[in-house]
Amino acid sequence: MKIKPKMISRFGVYSDPSQSRWLNLFNHVLSLPILFLSSRLANPSCHNLCTINTPPKHFRSLLGLGLKFCPTPSHTTSRAQIESSLSRFRTDFLTKVFFCDKRFDPHNTWTPGQLYLRSSDWSGPQLHAIPPEIHTRVSAFLSTIRPMFHKRRVRRNLTPIQERLLESFSNNPDFLVVPSDKNLGPVLLDRTTYVRRCLDDHLLHPTYERLTSTAANNFTSETTKLLQSFLQAHDQSISAGDTLYLHRYLASVTDPYAYFYALIKVHKSPWQTRPIVSVSGSTLYGLGKWLDRQLQPLIKTLPTYLPSSFTLKQELDKMGGTNFSRMSLFTGDIVAMYPSIQIHDAFEKIASYFTTLDTTIYPPNLINAILSALQLIMTRNCFRFGDTFWLQKDGTAMGTPPAPSFATLYYGIFELELLQSFGSHLHYLRHYIDDQFGIWIHDPDPQVDCQRWLDFKNRQSQFCSLNWVFSSLSSSVHFLDLTIHLEPYQISTSLYEKPLNLHLYIPWNSAHAPHIRKSVITSGIFRILRLITHRSEQQLHLAKFFTRLLARGYNHSFLYSTFQHALNRFATRTNACLPRTSVPELFWPNSPPLHTTDESAFFHLPYHPQDPPSRLLQSAFREHIFHPVSLQKKRIFARTCDPSSYYGAFYNGDEWVRAPPRIVQLRHVEPKLTDLRNLNGQHIPIDRLIVAYHRAPNLKNLLFPRHSEGKCPSATSVSSTLDLPQDDEATDIPSHN
């Protein structure tokens, strides 16, 4: 009797030797849940780059789900979990009610998107600061929500084999599951190969320097002191809200280090690695976010700045009617741009460029704060890799929030000079971080044209010793996610897809909220209709998209209805009956107007497919907070028909008898929440509840967590891979100014 559960636990199926294989297969299919049969994947695949160890059998059944797949938690949301959510809702809701009049304060300096961290000491307004009616409504809402949630065990969306593989791959000493560059699918790699390639390709280069643990701790402590000095020195240059955010963030830091990891470029032959430094939560992350907000408006003024492929498509459509007979397309790519940038030269170029700006927008004290923040962030990038500590000595500090803006600004300043020198040959020039796209105007003399094209490439390669790779001049190029074609009087575009893209969309049975599935489909359809010029190609890509979603377990009826809804929505927004319009308005549909007086209350909740749906929570909000209807008990006495009788009594023939009262319930409609006022006399503008789900950990969180190369105690450490003791032959750096 013990053999059957053991076989099911190990192999996921029990085969009775006394029965035929077809009967065993039939019984196995009957035992499967309907979810696994209706949403079975047709393309479970991944990139296997293992050369040392042999992966376990059926590993593609797990990794083929994609790293965005969320396994269903074994239990529904417990009472303890919902209590924390209810407590947060009470605090957030009462805080919104308390401060709802501040948005009309003329002295309020708050702006949308402003950096903000709530004080750790804030636990909501005091009890007497909120009207009693609001407390009553919130308590009624919480009392209704609380009984809806109770912990119970549920069936997971993984087979026994997949659960065993998930347990095996978590902190495995032999294998690592690594995301691929360009989102081409998960990569299974030998752990030692991954660590060795990270060291050989990046960390052992002169750009980086290894530190001892003592030196790294001293370095991060000194960085904290420098950041505090920065805040004191530039207190008058930074707004009060941003200063408050920076102080609160610095006080909340628990781990001062950033962490290094690499993505696998499987589309390269042989495969390569892309270095990434995750700085979220580190000492300088808050300052980096502030600096990026200062640089973003500046880079948007550069003539060669390109924010996205949608903007590129819009600008190319505006060129319709131009004679392109003497023009060609080209692209350029900088190899390892971030480490190649010479920091001191970049500081000089950017500081010189700041002197040309309007002082009313960028006053000198703000410019000094920006340059000081750049100096601090770009020269203090200290991070961990496994049990080792490293310092980036040169180049752009990878992973920091202002890194893309810094690199874009630095090269955009140089491109201003490039446009002056080669403007007669450049009909169009744009760049997106390290990628460049342009339209070249040919000279009538072929020899002159060839020399000018060569000078253009050499001029860029000589700037900052960047290693450029240019395409040849042609009528068709690949740039970002587009294939751009040069036609006689227009430029058409289509989608470009990497050949090794596995198209692992979120499977149907993933533990995501239902609206996520629809949003993935809708955004994919909108992307096809916005970026593709010709209608025949739109239909071809829509058909491919439909087929790929079927392979991920989606059913036909759901896809048909969602596709039709998305197409109708797109046609409505673009005021077109068919998705063939190529006018610029097609690519920037206007959103429906929002009522500026309406606000939402947010209910943060962990998502579980077996929990009560969001519509029940929103219904409870409407019934108990927004527009409650209460039932009040009232005593009603009998009334006789005798005109001489008095109310509440009747004559039984001998004497007058008082009638017993009858208890009834009467509906009492209370005023809407928007009709109530807080204690400052301001109307409360909250009219709806948004259930903000946060998903369960996905496969990427489980198989490739932060600092994954150092979390397996039985694996070979990074310092051992270096063939060095952990702190030997590492540099002891007391300080870096």
What are these regions (language model features)?
Residues 1-737:
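Charged structural interfaces that engage phosphate-rich ligands
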